[in-house]
From Swiss-Prot:
Family from the record: Belongs to the GreA/GreB family.
Induction remark: By heat shock, salt stress, oxidative stress, glucose limitation and oxygen limitation.
InterPro entries from the UniProt entry: GreA/GreB_C_sf, TF_GreA/GreB_CS, Tscrpt_elong_fac_GreA, Tscrpt_elong_fac_GreA/B, Tscrpt_elong_fac_GreA/B_C, Tscrpt_elong_fac_GreA/B_fam, Tscrpt_elong_fac_GreA/B_N, Tscrpt_elong_fac_GreA/B_N_sf
PROSITE patterns: GREAB_1, GREAB_2
Gene3D superfamilies named among the record's database cross-references: Transcription elongation factor, GreA/GreB, C-terminal domain (3.10.50.30), Transcription elongation factor, GreA/GreB, N-terminal domain (1.10.287.180)
Iron is among the record's keywords: no
Record function comment: Necessary for efficient RNA polymerase transcription elongation past template-encoded arresting sites. The arresting sites in DNA have the property of trapping a certain fraction of elongating RNA polymerases that pass through, resulting in locked ternary complexes. Cleavage of the nascent transcript by cleavage factors such as GreA or GreB allows the resumption of elongation from the new 3'terminus. GreA releases sequences of 2 to 3 nucleotides.
This protein's UniProt keywords: Coiled coil, DNA-binding, Stress response, Transcription, Transcription regulation
Coiled coil: 50-70
Protein name (database record): Transcription elongation factor GreA
Single GO biological process annotation from the record: DNA-templated transcription elongation
Length: 157
């Protein structure tokens, strides 16, 4: 039997996934079932776009429920080791781009909870891979979609 993938994440990340799962199971499923029921009342299902749309949404919701259940079941909570001198999962790292000094901060999280718009990047991302295990004042070459850039780590928290 194949071993299931482990999803490293913070406790906060797991809690957010559990909240999303609860919402999908208790609220969204009921909404979709109601939409299907209403669409069925329109009659002929062969050309009923409301019905097709509701069934597609139901498939998406059920797929997301399955995905979330798997991620939660196989979550590996990353505990903060208390030290903040090394870049690791769950840590926020601030660095400056050399030589111009543009400062950026990211929290490194498991892929299941990554959200670049919230400043959370996956530990599997090229930037995180370059930074993991490094310390304050280290200069690191980071791979980005735009090419390589040299950064200096200024803070880890």
């Amino acid at each position: 039997m194949a071993q299931e993938k482990v999803f490293p994440m913070t406790a906060e990340g797991k809690q957010k996934l559990e909240q999303e799962l609860e919402y999908l199971k208790t609220v969204k499923r009921k909404e979709v079932v109601e939409r299907i029921k209403i669409a069925r009342s329109f009659g002929d299902l062969s050309e009923n776009s409301e019905y097709d749309s509701a069934k597609e949404e139901q498939a998406f919701v059920e797929g997301r429920v399955t995905t979330l259940e798997n991620m939660i079941r196989n979550a590996k909570i990353i505990e903060d080791d208390g030290g903040s001198n090394v870049v690791g999962l769950g840590k926020t790292v601030t660095f400056v781009e050399l030589p111009d000094g543009d400062e950026e901060s990211y929290t490194i999280v498991g892929s299941a909870e990554a959200d670049p718009f919230e400043g959370k990047i996956s530990n599997d991302s090229p930037i995180a891979k370059s930074l993991l295990g490094k310390k304050v004042d280290e200069e690191v070459t980071v791979q980005t979609p735009g090419g390589e850039m040299l950064v200096k780590i200024v803070k880890i928290s």
